[in-house]
Amino acid sequence: MTTTVIILAAGKGTRMRSHLPKVLQPLAGRPLLGHVIQTAKQLNANNIITIFGHGGAQVQQQFQQENIQWVEQTEQLGTGHAVQMTLPVLPHDGLSLILYGDVPLVRQQTLEKLLAVSSTTGIGMITLRVEDPTGYGRIIRESDKIQAIVEHKDASEQQRQIQEINTGIYCVSNQKLHEWLPKLSNNNAQGEYYLTDIVAMAVADGLEIASIQPDLAFEVEGVNDRLQLAALEREFQLQQAKSLMQQGVTLTDPSRFDLRGTLKIGQDVRIDINVIIEGNCELGDFVEIGAGCVLKNTKIAAGTKVQPYSIFEDAVVGENTQIGPFARLRPGAHLAAEVHIGNFVEVKNTSIGVGSKANHFTYLGDAEVGAGSNIGAGTITCNYDGANKHKTVIGDAVFIGSNSSLVAPVSIGDGATVGAGSVITRNVPENTLAFERAQQIEKANYQRPQKLKK
């Protein structure tokens, strides 16, 4: 049976008070709508139809690489009207899941259950039991069968005691959608076309409406303002933290951990507080990440220790490496095993060989460092001439003295030594001592100037 996913994403999101369309607001590093599209893809849906409206150009631009059919809702006349807009492109066979771009965290397994129960009845929905149902549509049942949805404002006092509510997520036969949607009426106080009216149509046709409830309440929570967005972010992050801990990761405080992408982990990984992981990252066995670190699209091999407040982006780190605190690995940083990168060292588009060290206050950009070399404090690779970047090559077992400037393009041969304070502008042969600085001048019995009395 074919599966279509219809995503309603046309709302403006006025309460967000943002120039950004609501469905593009980020949650865990991905737009709200991106979470829903990802789930639809996990279901192997045959069609994904997204209904856009406010900020439509921005929304389409954000997801231009996705295989999506876009349908415009020029006027926001209700949820029923939104789904009506899909009829010209909606298949006549199979089932459609109706989801929302601002309800981002409904899980694949929940929707698979909904598809399963709906396949025999032709219509199913997700409901939820809550302690305080105020403001939500109530599920009216007779002999445990759904008969109607009554909005809160229209509910009697007895009906308002019902704690089972409508989440708005449906699975409906496409044949029935083609039959029911044209019959929707806007004869109500709001003058809108309500999707909930298809429930009454199903009952009138003698269909039994299947229903399921999610395992986790936050799956069906929507986002209307920044408070709700922040609350859902924390719920989601806590679930991700729990999943990692169940896989053997030690998180010092699960409530102070953010995963904004995917993380592949080995055994006995330890992550301290306030660590942010973005994009696609991988941590090998026995890796330790200190407090306040940010990792983005980075792979760290087994046994490496990262001290607090280090930032990595598009970097690869070898085994048993020591990094930080306050180190920065920029895109193209590639560290071999047993490298030491210390405090306030920045590495960009540079490979560093086995066992080499840059322990203090150093910039290595567009460079190649061999094995077993020592880069002294304050060393700078001067890679930019104001127009172009140039490469510095440092061989194996090289010693670079403190406060040296290596003006690229330049190479330092294996076993060479550069004296402290040098500005190296020419290639240094292997096993050579090179130094370049002004001669030291001494003035005996020198008296510093005295401050003038006011």
Curated annotation (Swiss-Prot):
Keyword Magnesium recorded: yes
Pfam name, any one: Hexapep
Pathway recorded for this protein: Nucleotide-sugar biosynthesis; UDP-N-acetyl-alpha-D-glucosamine biosynthesis; N-acetyl-alpha-D-glucosamine 1-phosphate from alpha-D-glucosamine 6-phosphate (route II): step 2/2; Nucleotide-sugar biosynthesis; UDP-N-acetyl-alpha-D-glucosamine biosynthesis; UDP-N-acetyl-alpha-D-glucosamine from N-acetyl-alpha-D-glucosamine 1-phosphate: step 1/1; Bacterial outer membrane biogenesis; LPS lipid A biosynthesis
PROSITE patterns: HEXAPEP_TRANSFERASES
Keywords for the protein's UniProt record, in alphabetical order: Acyltransferase, Cell shape, Cell wall biogenesis/degradation, Cytoplasm, Magnesium, Metal-binding, Multifunctional enzyme, Nucleotidyltransferase, Peptidoglycan synthesis, Repeat, Transferase
CDD domains: GT2_GlmU_N_bac, LbH_GlmU_C
Top-rank EC class of the record's enzyme: transferase
Disulfide bonds: none
Example of a GO cellular component annotation carried by this entry: membrane
Coiled coil ranges: none
Main subcellular location of this protein, as a coarse class: cytoplasm
Region annotation (Linker) ranges: 227-247
Known EC number: 2.7.7.23, 2.3.1.157
Active site: H360
Subcellular location: Cytoplasm
Function: Catalyzes the last two sequential reactions in the de novo biosynthetic pathway for UDP-N-acetylglucosamine (UDP-GlcNAc). The C-terminal domain catalyzes the transfer of acetyl group from acetyl coenzyme A to glucosamine-1-phosphate (GlcN-1-P) to produce N-acetylglucosamine-1-phosphate (GlcNAc-1-P), which is converted into UDP-GlcNAc by the transfer of uridine 5-monophosphate (from uridine 5-triphosphate), a reaction catalyzed by the N-terminal domain.
Subunit-level organization: Homotrimer.
Family from the record: In the N-terminal section; belongs to the N-acetylglucosamine-1-phosphate uridyltransferase family. In the C-terminal section; belongs to the transferase hexapeptide repeat family.
Annotated protein name in UniProt: Bifunctional protein GlmU
Lineage: Bacteria, Pseudomonadati, Pseudomonadota, Gammaproteobacteria, Moraxellales
